[in-house]
Amino acid sequence: MHNFSDQCLDLARSLLSNNLQHINEDGSVTPAPGEQARVDEPGHAALAIGEFFRATGEVELGEHDLYDLTARCVTQQAFVEEENDNGIAYASLGLLSFGASKERNAVWERLLDPTREQLDRGLLERSEYDDHFQAFSIAKSVARFSFGLTKKDDTGKVIDRFVEGIEKNSSGGFCNDDPNGPSGVYDIYGLLSFIFVRQALQLHANVHLKDRKLPKLRTFAEKYLRMLPD
């Protein structure tokens, strides 16, 4: 019997192996039967592959080159015409999973100059949100600083904006995804936001920021844990 962590890795390896075949040559993702394609799926795929690489150090899975697959997904996501902070945020974290700087990143080395320039432009676009999309702004800020697009790290301020939104829009300290609605929306995206922000901070080149910001974030995230049944 394998220990729990080994079982988790085996499951991740199996799931990823079954899904990599659906990534096309151009980095787009073929949807499952009955589902519609999403503009952010290439970015999601890039992060899934990147997290697997971080956990295992493996650069191949079956016949698939993980560096090449990730580069294709990032390229596809970078050139999506629709506004998609979601996809860009996921793609940038997927890229960071292979190295915390451009100079030591095997996937970045495989990107063509037009893709690099387009990705830089996407990351430099700053947006503020009142819902879970603020978590994507945090991830983009992490990538901006880590990839050297800015010398000043504004991630702390973007996180503060996220926390202020929670405190302003929910008396119970939960993420309200519809602060302008009559009753608000409190769903799984609130919990997802904290997981995503934690993931972003783990990949941040500014390692001290995580120690400063996690305690405050944890006080809100623990509210969700208390809701889980014993």
Model regions: which residues?
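Low-complexity, Ser/Thr/Pro/Gly-enriched N-terminal "stalk/linker" regions
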Residues: 1-44, 48-51
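Aromatic-lined, polymer-binding surfaces characteristic
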Residues: 34-56, 63-221, 227-230
